[in-house]
Amino acid sequence: APWLNSNKVGIKIIIPILAFILGYKKTLGTIDQIKVLPANTLMEKLAKVFIGKIKITGHSNIQSNGSQIFVCNHPTGIADGLVIWSTLSKKRPDIFFFANKDVTHLLPQMQDIIAPVEWKNNKRTLRSKKETLAYAKKAFEAKRSAVIFPSGRLAQRTGLKLKERPWFTSAVKLASKYDIPLIPINIKARNSFLFYLFDFIH
């Protein structure tokens, strides 16, 4: 939020309080622990930290071999990916995600499970699209399965409700091109009260 960069005395007092509430130091400690881990180990570590009690149905729709494309809503952000990974990887350890390429810049080892996507329109180029499609082609030829969040963004808060943003057609196009079944996943979840409070303030 731009107001956090203000030099006002009140803001300078608020920042350390926010850092304490949000567990900033703990987060930095977690980052230090995971930044050198292999992709799958890293995901396991984060899943243990962030995933609480969950109820899962529809396991029978997960094939043990052959490519599938799982399309999913995106209510909570990173936690969505962790839940999906912890669920699917038990049966499909070859799973990969179409996700923000910035992740692979920060954590290069995540290239093992991330097809890099440039979500920012002003940075999206023919080269970046080819990079994404080349990753997908290689993965699907190896019969790997993919996860796509077709909205490309976190669900939008509208009052007290979450509204999924419009979906891009990328998943349908890939499924058609490679003759791969599409499997829908629906996550019923919300972020914390603090998350929505800060979203409102922002």
Identify the residue ranges that each predicted region occupies.
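Membrane-anchoring hydrophobic helices of lipid-metabolizing enzymes
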Residues: 1-71, 81-83, 92
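Catalytic core of membrane glycerolipid acyltransferases/transacylases, capturing the structured
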Residues: 24, 68-125
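Short, flexible loop segments at the rims of nucleotide/cofactor-binding pockets, characterized by
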Residues: 32, 45-51, 74, 122-127, ...
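Hydrophobic/aromatic ligand-binding patch that stacks against planar heteroaromatic rings
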Residues: 87, 138, 173-174
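Active-site glycine-rich loop that binds ribose-phosphate moieties when present
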Residues: 122-132, 164-169
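A structural motif
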Residues: 139-153
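A cross-family acyltransferase "interaction/gating" segment
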Residues: 145, 158-202
